[in-house]
Amino acid sequence: MEADYYSPEHSDADDGGATPVQDERDSASDDEGNEREQRSEPGSPERQSEDEHSDIEDNKHRSDSGSDNEEGAEHNDSEDEHRPHNSSDLENHDASDSENEESRNHIASDSEDDVRRQKGSDSEGSPVKDAASDSDEEPIRHSASDSEDDGPRKEQANDSEDERHKKNTASDSEDEAPAKHQGSDSEDEAPAKHVASDSEDEAPAKRAASDSEDEAPAKRAASDSEDEAPAKRAASDSEDEAPAKRAASDSEDEAPAKRAASDSEDEAPPKRAASDSEDEAPPKRAASDSEDEAPPKRAASDSEDEAPAKRKVSSSEDEAPSKQAFSASKKSSKKSSGDSEDKARGKRAIIDSDDEDEDVPVKRAASDSEEETHPKGKASDSEDEAPSKQQPSDSEEETPAKAAANNSEDEFPRMKRKIVSSDDSDDEIDRKPLQKKKKKSPRRSSESDSSDKVDSKKRKASESDEEEEKASKKKSAILSDSEDEDAANKSGNKKSRILSDGDDSDSDAGSDRPKQKKKLASSDSEEEDELKSKTEAKNADKLFGSESDSGNEEENLIADIFGESGDEEEEEFTGFNQEDLEGEKTVTSANKQHAAAADSDSDDDDVKPGKMGDFKSDFEIMLERKKSMSGKRRRNRDGGTFISDADDVVNAMIMKMNEAAEEDRNLNSSKKPALKKLTLLPTVVMHLKKQDLKETFIDSGVMSAIKEWLTPLPDRSLPALKIREELLKILQELPSVSQETLKHSGIGRAVMYLYKHPKESRPNKDIAGKLINEWSRPIFGLTSNYKGMTREEREQRDLEQMPQRRRMSSSGGQTPRRDLEKVLTGEEKALRPGDPGFCARARVPLPSNKDYVVRPKWNVEMESARYQGSSKKGVSRLDKQMRKFVDIKKKNRFGHAVKISIEGNKMPL
């Protein structure tokens, strides 16, 4: 059978039949002929026909005539590709439409069942699959039925091109024309009725439902090249959509490319030739023309959608058309199950007549993109692609919408649709009920509503599992191509518009529904989401706090203690190392938790009254009293505790300090010398340096008094230098001060002021910086900064912090300490049994209470090392030469074998 298609005579006839079509249509076909020749060279059926000769003339003539149609279609398509989008495109698309219809009529007259199944299943793939045994004869019949009046059909195609071009130009050239085609039932409903009445239900309905002229024409094009090429080129020359993708695929749907490559010997054979006799190898055609397999399988069942999806992902045919075919295959699978095909056509005819005039012209009017989707609609005459994509009338149009988006019908129309979708957002709500009504009316006009509803319910029920797989595969098919991702993103508005039809929103896009519903109700849902997010954020902040809060707390605390950072800009505090500051925030939360834990531990003694209410037991009152008294308890040097008797002295001292500061302020404001603080300073320093009173001073509020002494006078002059020096030293010697004390006393602000003051002395500034560093490190959760300390400072700090061990008293049953020297010298006799303090056992040595803080002195004399170093430096050349000489001698000694005397001479025995 391949020899029939690929015979040399057949190829010659094809070449002869194609040239008049080129002459009739345009002179631009020269370039296209060259392109065709170039395409035909690699795997053209002509070469194959030369290799594979056959003598069957009937098939040859049929294939010749069929190829004439296909070459005409190729020329039309190639002309469509190269021509500017003008009336010639319309003619070509119309020609493809008319040729589709005429070929359908011829097919209906010749072998409506077989050939239309072939066409319906895209005549390249489905003949192979619907009539695998007659796969060669039926396509031949099909091409014969088309080729019987091939020349006439071309003439009719040209005439119909003129007529439809007139119709198209009369009716917005492609919007109204397909709408009329579809609305007049002559092109849509008539074929659809033929489909319904004849076995064409599978084929044309599949064409119609399966985007017949992206899918079916893509394969009809194989058999009716004029259908396929215009269809795909209407679809592919849908001017941006597929050309971009088909240009990317280097062969408008592998089928047009193969057609062009084979000079349209039969665009079915070209595909067959390209796919190595796709009739013989239908799986290859299925692989290459996933749309061929898809329609027959769609006719067979709905589960094939999964396979078409995969095929379409794998097939390089038009990533977009393959997905259109895929989405269309869902249509076809759903619509081929019953008369819903006719209903879909009726719907699409009416809906397209209305909505294409509404949506499509609006979306496509600004450019030739009218032809893009419309050529698709026209190419399929059933206008399943464009209508289904343009109109959410069918529940499947969710998928076509995705197919339209995936096909990126045209990137420009897409953009226009985006814009129009926003512009027509007011009309969307009106259109949707209209479209729903239109959906219902065509269903009623074509057949009863219940058939579609029952079918759709059955589909939903039967395909509920398949649809999930479809959705996943759809997503994989869609997301596999970046163009499709862009298309899907760009068609978001369109999807939202399409999916707003609650009646028709099948589970095809079940996973996308919530997103698209959110898009439709974006104005409400976004506000709700914002409110929710705000409330959640507030709740989270209340429950857990936030980093900004913690940072603000630290900043506020620092501001409370040391004042605002912007008060004086003369000198900034640079006490912290960078690595310390980097770790601040991470440590603060932990430290706060530790502080909270410490507070809770310290409060363990007190039963928290907040939990128990205001009721306090006698025990709690007693604990409170005890706690209030504990502030006055101090540790003595020997570890004993005592209640300070110096509280009255401390309080009197603080009173005097405050009075002196107040008097100095008054004197300064009255322009008199303020000497009260200076006269009192020696007494204050004397008391503040008493180690046992320091904590008492701090508890009694000496920090606020020191702050009064360090603050500038009313005339902004600093207190006396001696006062500043002495008090800063005392502050440095005071034990650690709590944050609360620092905060309430205001000492931090006074010290910071001195630190930043330009007239403060450098030693005082250094002390002030150290104080600020020491006080602020606990706030940021930092430990002592040992890096900033010198060795002496570290040693001094260790000595100061060395714990004062309680010395074991020699009273009680403990062994009195004896002086070992006296025992050894005999001055003190060793204890004997019966003596007090005697132990009749070996005594365990007492643990050492020594903290080895001070490093022991190095007892080794360093002079020897120094001498060696100096001697090394002072080595003379003579010594070096002598050493070398000695080394050479040593080497030479062992340079030769040791001679052993057999007689035993010279043996060191």
UniProtKB/Swiss-Prot annotation:
In terms of Pfam families, this protein maps to:
Med26
Q: Name one GO cellular component term.
A: nucleus
Q: List the residue ranges of the region (2 X approximate repeats).
A: 451-530
sequence repeats: which residues? Answer: 451-470, 511-530
Which regions are flagged for Basic and acidic residues bias?
47-65, 72-122, 138-165, 177-301, 360-381, 444-455, 531-541, 789-800
Please list where the region (Disordered) is annotated.
Answer: 1-615, 786-820
> Where does this one sit in the cell?
Nucleus
Q: What keywords sit in the KW lines?
A: mRNA processing, mRNA splicing, mRNA transport, Nucleus, Repeat, Transcription, Transcription regulation, Transport
Bias class Basic residues marks the residues at: 434-443
The residues forming the signal peptide are none
Which ranges does the record mark as transmembrane? none
Tell me where in this chain the TFIIS N-terminal domain is found: 704-782
**GO BP term, example:** RNA splicing
The similarity annotation says: Belongs to the IWS1 family.
Query: What does this chain do?
Result: Transcription factor which plays a key role in defining the composition of the RNA polymerase II (RNAPII) elongation complex and in modulating the production of mature mRNA transcripts.
Name used for this protein in its record: Protein IWS1 homolog
Natural source organism: Xenopus tropicalis (Western clawed frog)
User: Corresponding gene?
Assistant: iws1
